[in-house]
């Protein structure tokens, strides 16, 4: 009611209004206070704390770690020469007041930091490694030119030789398996195309772009160009992958209930077909055409053989598929 109150010298624990209110409530009796329950969610399930983007990043980190990759955290600033190797290094990404000459530009890719870390490890005698990093990359000076990527590198041998077999060098199919695994765990569409034509730091003819249509790229995998490895003093076979997290569409909120099971009246069968086509025809063209011929009954089309030479003649190849 506005009455003044003084604190005795032997009560140094009372520092403010909240402490005074607590003392009054204790003297009067806490049982006389009316309890007010906290508001509860009507669905009895707490709302998620992480956003969809944060949850996707967390899932991709865990997926890469489960595949045996060690996470790196590097600076977003790199030197001009390294930036130019990956398509950057122009005035739009240059810092006005850089920390040093080695941190003068915003990174256009995550590979410079990963390769620098790999080079330092190789200088100390560690030649087999699997590293990944998740972070922003910058393709210009405007806010819309920033996107989040997940990149990883495999270097050296897959495993040490033992009584069960010899070791082997890492190859493109190792990272192809890894990137497809991560994409499936973060909810990317399972139907995609693998095309060519990535940036110049990828080895020509030894890489692939995972696309949703001909223009929307969600991932790249393959061997890194030898000139890139030479610039960072990397020894041994090196393959890598990049996932463009911002390009992956967010899955729609679908109903959790499943439709009733409907048994098919047709028996499951497999048939093999071989087609003679031009040497430059992509296998995905054949599989897409085969899948589209009878979408209601065809569940899967996969390539199992390719033959070039023999009686086919120049500029021809045979592609065999299983339907």
Labelled PLM ranges:
Residues 26-29, 65, 69, 77, ...:
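Hydrophobic alpha-helix feature that most strongly marks membrane-spanning transmembrane helices
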Residues 1-132:
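Extended, well-folded interaction surfaces typified by the phenylalanyl-tRNA synthetase beta subunit core
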Residues 38, 74, 136-139, 194, ...:
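Hydrophobic/anchoring residues in structured secondary elements
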Residues 19, 38-41, 82-83, 98-100, ...:
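Short capping/connector residues at structural and topological boundaries
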Residues 4, 13, 145, 151, ...:
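A carboxyl-terminal module marker
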